[in-house]
Amino acid sequence: MARKVIALAFLLLLTISLSKSNAARVIKYNGGESGGGGGGGGGGGGGGNGSGSGSGYGYNYGKGGGQSGGGQGSGGGGGGGGGGSNGSGSGSGYGYGYGQGNGGAQGQGSGGGGGGGGGGGGGGSGQGSGSGYGYGYGKGGGGGGGGGGDGGGGGGGGSAYVGRHE
């Protein structure tokens, strides 16, 4: 009987200890660093074609008394080749930030377009495109940061979208 009581007491203490460490882990998680996108490739020379694309995604989450950082993602496009070649590139970025409780959140995303190829002795053409998306959300005592995004194309167009702000 004594062994059963000791075993039950040990299990109870272990359960309480684990639940406390899990709660602390949730509160301490205040948003990490977000990753950036990759860059595109370069084109070939002498009548060759070159194209590249890159994209990035960032996500951050904060809960409790913590403050979440801004999610940030970006991608750069590729450049074209020389000597009568064509070059194209595209880039896109997405960022998301979320804060709950006393924390604020902000999201930011950006993407830059690629540059076109130049003609060395021959004609060359280039095009690029870029897009960005940002989202910010805050709940409880914290204010949500503004979502911001921007994108610019090298030789091409760019677009920007601002996400929800609460």
Swiss-Prot record:
Residues 105-125, 144-166 are annotated as: Disordered. It is found in: Secreted, Cell wall. Keywords: Cell wall, Cell wall biogenesis/degradation, Repeat, Secreted, Signal. Its main location: secreted. GO terms for cellular component: extracellular region. The keyword Chaperone does not apply. The keyword Transferase does not apply. Residues 1-23 form the signal peptide. Transmembrane segments: none annotated. R repeats lie at residues 56-62, 93-99, 132-138. One of its GO terms (biological process) is cell wall organization. Residues 144-160 have a biased composition (Gly residues). PANTHER family: GLYCINE-RICH CELL WALL STRUCTURAL PROTEIN 2 (PTHR33548). Responsible for plasticity of the cell wall. This is Putative glycine-rich cell wall structural protein 1.
